[in-house]
Amino acid sequence: MREWLQGLPKHERRIIGIDVMTVQYRWPLGMPLVRNLGSALWEIRSALQNRIARTLFFVHEGEIVLLHGFIKKTRKTPTEDRALALQRKNAYLKTS
């Protein structure tokens, strides 16, 4: 997650950071900023200048845990991105 963010331009990181902070301090939220993906997974929908970023997360013991981020290219969340987020969620839960 951190590497993905660091690879983005500064102004895009700022937009995503503001959206993550909004979710952190105003949870629970719904559309248009946050959408439920099922399996206790959620996505933050960040509108960048000419593309859309998604940050997948879950809530554990009152904390928001960021799992995966990507630039969205289709209307539907790609299966491989969702699977990676679920894998990271399960790994996190095993160690906590």
Per-range role (PLM):
Residues 2-52, 60-64, 71-96:
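Basic, Lys/Arg-enriched alpha-helical interface segments
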